[in-house]
Amino acid sequence: MIATTLLLALAFGTANPAPPPLKVVTSLTTYGAIAREIVGDRGTVTSIAQGNEDPHFVQPKPSFVAILRDADLFVTTGLDLELWVPPLLDRANNRKVSEGGPGYVTAYTGIALLEVPTSLSRAHGDIHADGNPHIHTDPVNAIIIARNILVGLKRVSPEGADYFTRREQDFEKRLLEATMGTDLVSILTPAVAYKLLATDQLWDFIGKNSYQGAPLMTRLGGWLKAGEVFRGKEMACYHKEWAYFSNRFKIACAEFVEAKPGIPPTPRHVEDVIALMKERRIPALFASNYFDRNQIEQVAAKTGATAVVVAENSGGAPGTDSYFDLVNSWVNGLAAVYRKGAS
């Protein structure tokens, strides 16, 4: 009996202890929502900016420094959206999550950036030198962001690589299904479905091919199916944050209330936007909920359009905590307006 007890004690004493939970910090809540899909129960995820907060202008707080000081992984866009991030990292002095450290993840890596300026001038407003940084508004980009987070997690927690990989692959599959429908992903396989989306060949492919005697187009579902009602149409936008959404769902921002990013619109420009919306009979004004709601509603009222005011980031409005819920709010909000106009 004593020998057995000693053997058990030795066995438990030499077993590898479970690694402590990872502390993941993200600049934006949307990156946090994606990170949670992968981290699962192996860690905690904390976001610095609030979901209904303009990510360009976040007021640094001492508590943010403390969060970053203890972080194992930090996810940020990596462009010039969150100019408040570098000073926080400097003050935190955590080499693990400082730029170049193993726990520093740039969400934009591998994403084809849109609206890269040909010249830089303050006369154009707060333009982004490397391109539009609102990368998460395209679900395909969300897959790339998830893959970047996975790479970072493997660096800081190699013992959890298999666990994180399984969860990331599951997230990808569910996101593809939400984008184009479960049936189509099942027929194509997730790998082919992703490739067709990433190369912008999906519509051409499903328009030319059949499965079991029926056009593949009939198997389309998800957000792309719901967005067919506004595909090829125009909307007005408040700020230049929907470029990737517009590109994926093929709905153009015909004009912007905020013509120059970061600079309040002049009364003359607002009147020009109203005139254009009336002339083209644009039915929707798409805007994030951290902009001036009164101005958004006034422009919409003067044009007969509907103001579709949404959270740009996860958790920025009730019912948008997950990335899936967030995209649902965008697509369903616009689809309701364009369905009404089509009836």
Placement of each model-derived feature along the sequence:
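Bacterial N-terminal signal peptides
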Residues: 1-13
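Extracytoplasmic metal-acquisition and chelation regions
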Residues: 16-343
